[in-house]
Amino acid sequence: MSPTGSPATPALRHRTVLLDEAVEALVWRPDGVYVDGTFGRGGHSRAVLARLGPDGALVAFDKDPAAIAEAGTIQDARFSIEHESFAAMGERLAGRGHVAGVLLDLGISSPQIDEAARGFSFRFEGPLDMRMDTTRGITAAEWLAQAEEQDIARVIRDYGEERFAVQIAKAIVARRREPGDGGPLATTADLAALVAKAVKTREKGQDPATRTFQALRIHINQELEDLERGLKAAYDLLQVGGRLVVISFHSLEDRIVKRFMAAHARPQQDADPALRRAPLRAADLPQPTLRLLGRVKPGAQEVADNPRARSAVMRVAEKLAPAASGRGAAPA
């Protein structure tokens, strides 16, 4: 998928990032049950199905009704899809036992960015919606029309890492009080113009609205909360030897993924001062339950072919048996 506001590609075109690398890392047994937590337009799912044998199965998840419609074009008895966030995979798959692998391709897809009516990008004028699931929840415009100034500033600061968050929040609230052509923000163009006035300096090569749009999208869709829940659910569902493959597109996502994997890849007494002081034998110490298999970034050719891939980072881990020994070395 992709970060918000990247350079536009032809309308509604989508190129799956790290396609071969992700599927190679994920599928280790052709008769396993796998989860594609972010179906999108089905690039990874179709490639996974091509690798599975007749006894394999793939369960996909997606919030976006357009993705669910696209999934309907896959006529394969081994495939099913849930119109739900991947954060709910634990509940949805509770009766299916353990799975052989889980893939999460985070962020936003090119069709979502390039469809003006979705309101994800400042490059196209449209309603300020930003919902992944257009059938539920409030839009970005609705939230900005009612949120407290300090809450708006916090979201833009924490999720956009925007140093002008306070100024932007003040401008948004002031705009709500304006008569005539003022009032609450309604379109992507409204928000982009307001941010451009509030941000006093420009980062080279980046539109001043980039961080604000990212922050609002993350907040409206609860992306980081879903990621934390989804990682735990995936870990609990994985069988021994199962693979967790996560592709992230910005530092907030990657930081959560890296910390989650690292926490399970080192003996757990590292985080418990009492255990560190206890005179335990090595055999008595908590053992790692994930082995880190690497960190992959797109090659130069993929980035040249698909500029939206440039910020992608893929991390891979393998579930270990509870009594497994050894320490996974976390890549940088």
From Swiss-Prot:
Stated family: Belongs to the methyltransferase superfamily. RsmH family.
Name of this chain's protein: Ribosomal RNA small subunit methyltransferase H
Location of the protein in the cell: Cytoplasm
Key words, A-Z: Cytoplasm, Methyltransferase, rRNA processing, S-adenosyl-L-methionine, Transferase
Species per Swiss-Prot/TrEMBL record: Cupriavidus pinatubonensis (strain JMP 134 / LMG 1197) (Cupriavidus necator (strain JMP 134))
Catalysis performed (reactions): cytidine(1402) in 16S rRNA + S-adenosyl-L-methionine = N(4)-methylcytidine(1402) in 16S rRNA + S-adenosyl-L-homocysteine + H(+)
SUPFAM superfamilies in the record: Putative methyltransferase TM0872, insert domain, S-adenosyl-L-methionine-dependent methyltransferases
Top-level taxonomy: Bacteria, Pseudomonadati, Pseudomonadota, Betaproteobacteria, Burkholderiales
Any one Gene Ontology molecular-function term assigned to this protein's record: rRNA (cytosine-N4-)-methyltransferase activity
